[in-house]
Amino acid sequence: MSDTTPEKGSVDSVSPSASNGSNTNNPLNNSSPQPLKSNESDKKPKVTRRSVACKSCHSLKVKCTPSDPNNPSAPCVRCINANRICEIDLNQTRKRRKKSEILEAKRQAGQSLPEHKKEKNTPTQSGYNSSENYSSSINNANDSSLTSRYQSPMTFDPTSPMVFRPQASSAVPPISSNLNPQSAAPTPIPTSGIPPQLPSPHESAILRGNTTSPTSKDDEINQLKQRVRFLETELANKRLLANKKGFSNDSPTDLQSPPFVSKFDLESEISILAESSARLTDLTNQLNEAASRRIQLVSAKKPVDLISKGVITVAEAEERLKLYREQIYGRHPLIAIPDNMHAIEFSQSQPFLFNSIMSACNLITKNADKDVVLAIDNEAMTSVAVEVMVVGTKSVELVKAFSVLCLYYNSPELFKQRRYHMLNTICVSLLHDVGIFARPTYSYNQADGTLKQDASSKDKGNDEYRELVLITYFVTVSTCLVLRRSIYARWTPYVEECCSLLENSSQEKHRRLALFARMNNKLDKIHHIVHAPEMPGQKSGVSQYVIQELQRLLSDLKLKIKDNQYSLLSYYYSIEAYLHEPILTKVFKSDTELDGKAMKSIRYCTSSCLNALDEYSKLTPDQIALLPFPFGSRIMYTAGMLLRLRYLILSLPSHIDKELVPKRAVTSIQCVSKLVEQANILNPHNHYLTKMRLVLQLFIQTYATQVLELLSKNGNTPQNFKPDESETQQLRALAREYNDIRKVSKVSLVSDTRSAEPLDVLSYAATFRRENNDKPSAVAGSLRKSFSENDQAIKTPSQCGQFVSANNTPVPQVINSPPISQTNVPVLHQSQSIINGNNRNSAPLAFNNTTTPSLHQFGDVLPPSSMPQPDYRQFRLPSISNTVHYSSNPRLNANLANPDQLENSYQVLNDEFWSNLLSTDSTDRINFTSNNFNGNTSNDEVFFMNN
């Protein structure tokens, strides 16, 4: 708000200072300048108020009267009387004059100058410019000439009031003109430590020196130009001086730069950058030429495909393409290849995918030369590795090629040379880089040296690309679980979108792929929720509600699997077993009974493992040879888990039902082992089947060795199976009867023609098969009849609903329980031990079961004679104990693996997931661990830490 309007008649009255001509340029006088009158000297001069009141008078809305009538910029009367500083706020609201009034005031001021000359030696002049001059000075604030007129910087803050202090001098000669009036008002004093700022345009007497006014506008313009040149020279000298002293040339304090960014500052920055910069186009062209030359040197006239290199002929390539289309892709439609395309055309258009397809066909190639098969694998690996890692090509064809190599990985290698996880990592990176996720891609235009965004390909939204996304996901999940690493692939919303679209597809292959991806997603969740937090020192265990919810999700997926899809059913049950895998650190505690939760967990896990092996056993050898990598890894895990549970149940000190993990587990694993062996014999170049056989045999040998050691530690009778006092008396009576019969007959007590007579733990566990005795004894047959009658008195499992353990602990009925009571297991050995004080060396005993296939002997699963075994002697690591003696049963010792073979086999495989199932004890002996994690594996997680 403006102050009180001037009194009537103030227009005709002037202050004494007006007689000297200072009223013309007084900005604090709100009245317009008027011509002087002749009779003004006769009238008494009237004190006028200031146009801009001080803060105190403005707040009280009263007239602000200067204490010195000759100096309107002097402190007002009220502030002097109140003994306070008179401050003027230039930003306070005031009533603006109309533009027409401003123009009229300027016109009148221009007319009054010729009539009234200014006094040349006036000690003081008006201290304020008019408001219109103030506006023009603000509009010209970006001009560098206005910011360089002062030797020392002025402090100016538009938002703070101005305090009047003595005036500072200036060494720069001013220019006196109508555009730049001079005054004698006090100026602010610069304060050290405060950055230089623009001086207030309302302060007066800033410029001193020559007050000669120009005679015309042209002269005034020339003077302004000379002044600008002078200031530029002065600024350049200051910059040069600062550079010599070592100061930075962009320091505003040292160079007294203005508080705003001036034109000179921007031009200076651009000139600095331009001096040290080259053209962007030149640099781009230079780098592009070097990159093109590098690629030319790498791929200069070198063939890529196997036909051009002469590894295989065109006829062999056509045969392999037919095998892939009809058998591999026909049973597992994952990576499609063009139909009706000949080998020559395929190898020229997509050489890397062609090489990968040729390598995948090695799984079922029967009559090929071994060196040719290995050369195909090496060339397929070399071609994609050079193209990606050396040349730097990124294409969808390479993604497909890496996917085929990951799905049908068939390289004969030890764990130190394994590469399937590296292939998978490159495949994941390529999938991101090629822009399948609708990410824009760019290409370099060498003609004009620019980068242009490629047009979005319509094919990136088709089903083929969605298949690649899902395939890459579940291969990554399987690979990470095999290597015991955190799964770095995530089920993102885009993956969910791809899976949903394929689930609703009209093609059966798309729906099957989506179903398998869903199953792996549940496997991923189970790993992160149930098993990933299980590390040493952390609290393990998941609530029963979470287990039930995950089981419900799995059951929903099972409804979508057909009954004849044995491979999918086997994979499903392996995931279910992984879900219910018991926390062994809580289950297997010494001198404790299993609680209901542990019993249920073991029962569910065992049932799922058996179902997985049963479904896998329904496959033919040819179907097993065609299974991709994820299926075989889950079967190996399931077999190892089942054998570990079986042994740990046998070795528990608590008296529980040993059929909680039934002996059928051993026969099922042996059946799977024979099936894999048969498939490997039919397909000798399928090295992945050879590795599966090796892993399964490693589990079986470890189990057999530990059971024999368990027998040795407990006098050929495990502590769990030792009878109590009442049973001992019965055994003594049977021993006396046995001695009487032996003295009469002088023949063996028991014939090997019995269908099922488990006389020791290995026979009871069905892990060994003995040869039948061709000359059974009639006396032994009569004694066997008496023993059978005694068995019926004790109750066989077929007559009762419970299995009677050594200490008569009732447990629930278990399917496929042994046909004879367990109390008869240690009868002969224990009774003879009681009588004679030592163990009896009995003849080999047979375990015949007409309902199950003949069991395969341990240690005879060897590669074909045409395939030499690698030398594992350099990898000697902890092996089975050599202190266990098998003198009582030399045939068992012959059927067991050589300790050196066992330790070498363990070294070949000890860096993968089965290391969690096997471990070494304090004596460096391989055994089934009683933990869900291997203590040494926590150091393996360096960058792949659990999330």
Curated annotation (Swiss-Prot):
Induction: Expression is induced in biofilm. The lineage of its organism: Eukaryota, Fungi, Dikarya, Ascomycota, Saccharomycotina. Residues 54-86 bind DNA. GO terms for molecular function: DNA-binding transcription factor activity; DNA-binding transcription factor activity, RNA polymerase II-specific; transcription cis-regulatory region binding; zinc ion binding. Residues 19-38, 129-142 have a biased composition (Low complexity). Its main location: nucleus. GO terms for cellular component: nucleus. Residues 1-10 have a biased composition (Basic and acidic residues). It comes from the Eukaryota. SMART domains: GAL4. Homodimer. Disruption phenotype: Leads to sensitivity to weak organic acids and decreases cell adherence to silicone substrate. This is Transcriptional regulator WAR1. The gene is WAR1. Transcription factor required for yeast cell adherence to silicone substrate. Plays a role in resistance to weak organic acids such as acetate and sorbate. Binds in vitro to a nitric oxide-responsive element (NORE) but seems not to be involved in response to nitrosative stress. Residues 143-158, 167-185 have a biased composition (Polar residues). One of its GO terms (biological process) is positive regulation of cell adhesion involved in single-species biofilm formation. It is found in: Nucleus. It comes from Candida albicans (strain SC5314 / ATCC MYA-2876). Gene3D superfamilies: Zn(2)-C6 fungal-type DNA-binding domain (4.10.240.10). Keywords: Cell adhesion, DNA-binding, Metal-binding, Nucleus, Stress response, Transcription, Transcription regulation, Zinc. PROSITE patterns: ZN2_CY6_FUNGAL_1, ZN2_CY6_FUNGAL_2. InterPro entries: prtT, Zn2-C6_fun-type_DNA-bd_sf, Zn2Cys6_DnaBD. Residues 1-52, 96-222 are annotated as: Disordered.
